[in-house]
Amino acid sequence: MPFSEKEKDEKYLVSIPMIGGKGIQVPSGFISGQNIYSLFSELTIGYHDSVSFLNLPIPFSCVAANLVNGKEVILDQGNLAMAMRSSMAIPGVFSPVVMDTMLLVDGGIANNFPTDVGKAMGADIIIGVDVSSELRKMNELNTAIEIVDQLTSFMGMAKYEDNIKLCDIYIKPDIVPYSAASFSAVDIDTLILRGERAARAQ
């Protein structure tokens, strides 16, 4: 089923259909992001139409990658909730987002630390928080999530070192053993606390 049709059927954060007599089957290994999109829509009421994110009270843009051609896509206008959802569509974890003729996933594939985008927006001071994972060793590549995360890390390294140099303040919290799939409340609270500690250490 094309993703444009698949998205119409997404109902839950984790969409796991029952297929008669065959038990539970996960569609294409993807997690539906409909509930996340609904949450973003509630949080961004008033910014659902075609708006320039650069004119928001706090100017904003985010980065996605187009699976059709592999190119970086800077999202700085349109539907704010949809842009946010597109930029966090981690390959192999969340389903891609169809936007016009593009199939968008997490921008980490093309630009995993987009300080250059902030610089282009006119930022005077850049505080970069790096939550990328260290590359895993062979014995640590055991699950689909770990393999996809490793591939994403490789693909997003093209600009990585140069973009670190653009930071006025560079913060890298300790995120071990957490990953992009760490969504529990306990995981999130722990990561926030580690981020605060890393920032205060600067």
What label would you give each PLM region?
Residues 1-202:
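Patatin-like phospholipase
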